[in-house]
A protein has these predicted regions:
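Short linear sequence motif anchored by a di-proline
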Residues: 1-172
Length: 172
């Protein structure tokens, strides 16, 4: 499999990212595929929505995971990296949408209210799925409310990015 990389919320719309999902042709099989981050703008007045709020919604189908070693956020002219306190990689909970006409396979990241470390910079962040929870998310085997939660305090380390992302190589 692939090495998790920083999840860059400023990535250009045309950039394809890797997601992990159940193979729609064989639900027993997991697959890693490339997908565009953002919904088809054809169905939303020309806007591609990259996020979907967790509150009040259920996601019974088309769940996927975005492997990440950290995520980035921009506040004013500064950019920050956010990574798990223990240095481990994680997944962002997401839902995928099939390719339609000229729009490729795509996904949207599910968001939750920001935890204390991130809330100093922004109100929300992607829902974090830990490695031990990945199959629970993909298989819908536990209530969504147990997985799509705001992480507790001291879950993240937030660092200002002064030049390119730094990370160790991690294996899936």
């Amino acid at each position: 499999m692939s090495t998790p990389t920083p999840f860059d919320s400023e990535a250009p719309l045309e950039k394809l990212l890797r997601i992990i999902r159940r193979n729609p042709d064989d639900m027993q099989e997991l697959e890693m595929v490339e997908a565009r981050w953002g919904s088809n703008p054809r169905f939303s007045d020309g806007t591609s929505f990259r996020f979907v709020r967790a509150e009040g919604k259920t996601f019974p189908k088309q769940r996927c995971l975005v492997p990440a070693s950290e995520f980035h956020m921009t506040v004013g002219d500064k950019q920050y990296r956010v990574k798990l306190d223990d240095g481990n990689f994680f997944y962002l909970a997401a839902v995928w949408e099939p390719a339609i006409a000229e729009w490729p396979l795509s996904f949207r990241v599910i968001t939750v209210a920001a935890n204390p470390e991130v809330s100093r910079y922004q109100d929300r962040h992607g829902a974090i799925i830990l490695r031990r929870q990945r199959m629970q998310w993909l298989d819908n085997s536990v209530p969504e409310s147990d997985l799509l939660e705001t992480p507790p305090a001291r879950t993240f380390i937030v660092e200002e990015i002064t030049r390119g992302p730094r990370q160790k190589a991690l294996a899936l």
